[in-house]
From Swiss-Prot:
This is Glycerol-3-phosphate acyltransferase. The keyword DNA-binding does not apply. The chain crosses the membrane at residues 11-31, 63-83, 90-110, 126-146, 163-183. It is a multi-pass membrane protein.
Length: 210
């Protein structure tokens, strides 16, 4: 019996449910309401992520949203790292991070209409293999400084990061990142269309967002 078979026969699946529920906490929505900035779903693009929160003009709330959305992915992974069985730890960590990511994209509390997953993606990278998070940040920052498009920066970053992981980390994490990257692209389909016709907004504008 190989490692994968042992994992699927012994893993307590409630771990993935908890990971999903943690990932589904809509920090952007909660923080904007607590700060009396309105319902973020009716502002800008309607997205609950940090970039759209920035459109409220409150940088502190946007930064807090970014941090907490990252921590959703990172904390789940860190906890699994310390408490899981070494035999199937690699698979368990990757899947727990993936379910936290899915929770952010499809939160049960908001009728499965969540964010686009970029911050949580970064958090999962930080928790699983921190060099991948560094690569993500470097790529995102470089593209943003050159082009000033948050969406394009994210799309390039989630393309490069799995390639880096393929060469320097394990197979399970790489497969999980590829799946997450595909979801990020799907969630950014409208942004991609606008980028192709030159109508995508740069960060800091007041219309649509990522």
């Amino acid at each position: 019996m190989n490692e994968t078979e042992i994992f699927f026969q012994s893993t307590p699946w409630f771990i993935f449910l908890i990971s999903y529920l943690i990932g589904s906490i809509p920090f952007g929505l909660l923080f904007t309401k607590l700060a009396k900035l309105g319902d973020i779903r009716t502002i800008g693009s309607g997205n609950i992520g940090a970039t759209n929160v920035l459109r409220t003009g409150n940088k502190k709330v946007a930064a807090l949203t970014l941090l907490c959305d990252m921590l959703k992915g990172a904390i789940v992974v860190f906890v699994i790292k310390f408490f899981s069985d070494p035999l199937n730890k690699s698979i368990l960590i990757s899947l727990a991070g993936f379910f936290a990511f899915l929770g952010h994209l499809f939160p049960v509390w908001l009728k499965f209409k969540g964010g686009k997953g970029v911050a949580t993606y970064l958090g999962v990278c930080l928790g699983v293999y921190w060099p991948a998070a560094i690569i993500f940040i470097i790529v995102w920052s470089a593209i943003f400084l050159l082009m000033h498009y948050s969406s394009l920066s994210a799309l390039v970053a989630v393309t490069i990061t799995p390639i880096f992981v393929f060469y320097f980390s394990d197979t399970y994490f790489c497969c999980m990142l590829i799946a997450m990257s595909l979801f990020v692209f799907i969630k950014h389909s409208a942004n991609i269309s606008r980028l192709l016709i030159g109508e995508e907004n740069k960060i800091g504008t007041q219309n649509r967002d990522k």
